[in-house]
Amino acid sequence: MSLLAQLDQRIRHHGGLIVSCQPVPGSPLDNPAIVAAMALAAEQAGAVALRIEGQANLQAVRPLVTVPVIGLIKRDLPDSPVRITPWLEDIDALAQGGADIIAIDGTQRQRPASVSALLAEIHRLGKVAMADCSSLDDALECWQLGAEIVGTTLSGYTAEETPDEPDLALVQCLSVAGCRVIAEGRYNTPAQAAEAMRCGAWAVTVGSAITRLEHICGWYNTALKAAVYPANEQ
């Protein structure tokens, strides 16, 4: 049975939650052993797959879990805004680290390696390709180029301002177009994740709301301060 067929079964049985275990950089939780523990806990809690950044984290996670792992490498490049798996050698590193699915930036921006070249390398290594996209045009082009999965990962993150709500409209458009779409980006409540599935998502990736303690505490702190000190009293 293919990896995607196995994931189809997991999604039907467990509900389609993918957990992204990516601590805030520099956080006390930003340690491969801790990332691996979070990943194992997520699997035991019913996650159908995991999203793991960096070769060291991937190598720590892979021996502990049985669910598929989406691997990526983030880089800050001086000559390109593309951060997610920008180089061909990143794909080789992720494959060697045990990633089942390799995520790349699928946007139409200046980049060191073309989307088509990255997809070809993923497939040469026998892995499944996921394109993290920001728009309908991005995603449809990546789908046509052969990405087995498209994600709404970068919707709202390539402009100056990031909206608070997830892009459910993009999920629905991609589903209608026949794409296998993972809803990702600002799915901070179970209700939002459920709505994404109703809009046609194949699965939903949740990160900050589960694995970024600093973000969760920040949401609570903001709400509590607003309750104790209303705007007109500050």
Swiss-Prot record:
Residue ranges of the TM segments: none
What superkingdom does the record give? Bacteria
Segments forming a coiled coil? none
According to UniProt, this protein's pathway is: Amino-sugar metabolism; N-acetylneuraminate degradation; D-fructose 6-phosphate from N-acetylneuraminate: step 3/5
The answer to whether keyword Isomerase applies is yes
Instruction: Recite the UniProt keywords alphabetically.
Output: Carbohydrate metabolism, Isomerase
Q: What is a biological process (GO) this protein takes part in?
A: N-acetylneuraminate catabolic process
Q: What is its EC number?
A: 5.1.3.9
Name the enzyme group at the top EC level.
Answer: isomerase
Disulfides per UniProt: none
GO molecular function per UniProt: N-acylglucosamine-6-phosphate 2-epimerase activity
Q: Which reaction does it catalyse?
A: an N-acyl-D-glucosamine 6-phosphate = an N-acyl-D-mannosamine 6-phosphate
A GO term from the CC aspect: cytosol
**UniProt xrefs under InterPro entries:** Aldolase_TIM, NanE, RibuloseP-bd_barrel
Task: Tell me the function of this protein.
Answer: Converts N-acetylmannosamine-6-phosphate (ManNAc-6-P) to N-acetylglucosamine-6-phosphate (GlcNAc-6-P).
Q: Name the PANTHER family on file.
A: N-ACETYLMANNOSAMINE-6-PHOSPHATE 2-EPIMERASE-RELATED
NCBIfam families reported for this sequence: PRK01130.1
UniProt similarity note = Belongs to the NanE family.
Q: What is this protein called?
A: Putative N-acetylmannosamine-6-phosphate 2-epimerase
Q: What is the species listed in this Swiss-Prot or TrEMBL entry?
A: Klebsiella aerogenes (Enterobacter aerogenes)
The encoding gene: nanE
